[in-house]
């Protein structure tokens, strides 16, 4: 395990940041253990905010307290949790509590103590739709204190990651989703692909998972919003400065392309169970 000096360097001595920084480091030990146990060879992919930080932003991104994975099926999802529960790597021990078949609370013990913030792990029993990219996490100074090198791991294509974030922003208004959309939308994107995947994800959210009502108007995603109503989160510990009003303005402008639906996407927007066959055909064409 890293030394206190490496950890202090990681959180730059900022008050209240030791817990998030220790959790961020412990997540790397989780990934290394799962890699060594062959879990990623089974089609598992790290997704969500932690994936974006590890593979796309490094120290420029926010700390993400949760680990979200995509797995090809529920059996693999449960195997992932079984593999992690009561595991130890280089003096770091993991234990799962409040466990259900696909999610749990993650408890971590390290030689430097236990992170003082809650961490969750969740596994979706559905494959990603686009082929993942094999990436090595962005090199950080703290990695110099590890007993191992970070392995190359599967990460979602940026277009699918952002489409999933847009779908999440539709379902809930969380400042972490707003920040991720702002930060990762600054580069060049295949806008047509992002929009197509967003429409398909929302269709599945509404029809299969009961998350939201039909029809879906993509203007919801880029609508104005009173940022004062965003639920409180620890975003202030994770990134500076915290400017949700500026982020929202940028997000509304950057993602306006999601409203420019073609004929197929206009059909999908109805979120009708009767459209399952054409939806599947569009998925197959991705």
Residue ranges and their predicted role:
Residues 1-44, 55-67, 71-286:
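Structured mid-to-C-terminal alpha-helical surface segments
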Residues 46-51:
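Glycine-rich beta-strand-to-loop/alpha-helix junction loops that act as flexible
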């Amino acid at each position: 395990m890293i030394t206190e000096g490496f950890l202090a360097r990681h959180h730059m001595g900022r008050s209240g940041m030791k817990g998030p920084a220790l959790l961020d480091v412990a997540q790397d030990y989780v990934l290394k253990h799962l890699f060594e146990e062959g879990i990623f060879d089974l089609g598992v992919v790290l997704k969500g905010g932690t994936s974006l930080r590890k593979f796309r932003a490094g120290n420029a991104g926010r700390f993400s307290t949760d680990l979200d994975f995509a797995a090809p099926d529920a059996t693999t999802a449960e195997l992932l949790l079984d593999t992690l529960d009561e595991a130890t790597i280089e003096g770091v021990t993991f234990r799962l509590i409040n466990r259900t078949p696909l999610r749990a609370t993650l408890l971590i013990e390290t030689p430097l103590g236990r992170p003082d913030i809650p961490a969750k792990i969740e596994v979706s029993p559905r494959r990603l739709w686009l082929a993942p990219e094999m990436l090595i996490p962005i090199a950080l100074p703290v990695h110099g204190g590890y007993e191992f090198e970070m392995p190359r791991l599967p990460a979602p294509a940026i277009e699918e990651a952002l489409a999933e974030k847009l779908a999440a922003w539709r379902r809930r208004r969380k400042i972490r989703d707003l920040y991720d959309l702002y930060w990762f939308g600054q580069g060049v994107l295949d806008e047509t692909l992002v929009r197509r995947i967003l429409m398909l994800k929302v269709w599945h959210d509404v029809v299969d998972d009961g998350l939201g009502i039909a029809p879906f108007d993509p203007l919801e995603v880029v609508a104005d919003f009173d940022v004062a109503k965003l639920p409180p989160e620890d975003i202030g510990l994770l990134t500076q400065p915290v400017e949700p009003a500026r982020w929202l303005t940028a997000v509304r402008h950057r993602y306006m392309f999601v409203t420019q639906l073609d004929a197929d996407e206009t059909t999908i927007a109805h979120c009708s169970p009767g459209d399952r066959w054409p939806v599947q055909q569009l998925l197959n064409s991705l």
